[in-house]
């Protein structure tokens, strides 16, 4: 992951004008103990650590193209979702990242990456998750992630246990 403290330019006017403002969808968590705000953006390849005044302290970027690619009509050429789901505890923030085009017919046959940060914004670890998860939570005491998966053939939904966190 690349760490940045600078926000690159993005054409927000085009986004507002074309109705593509959904690309600013963000998962936001705050810690009263560390006075930090941690955000994971759905359509930008960023996880941001800010202070309570909104000042950017640190930014993680995991890929080469952090900004959504929009044409002049505000249409996204590739519907790439970065932070798909997230979860926080008193100790850590977890961001389940996808980073692949959601328009692919097999999008839910691919795995995901779980990023674990402490409340000071330090990278703790990352984990490969072999399935596409539709929801999750973490049992930190037992080191287990519980994830919601689907089975296309049977049309069923189940909870899968991932140990070793």
Q: Which stretches of residues belong to each language-model region?
A:
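Eukaryotic scaffold repeat domains enriched in small/polar residues
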Residues: 1-165
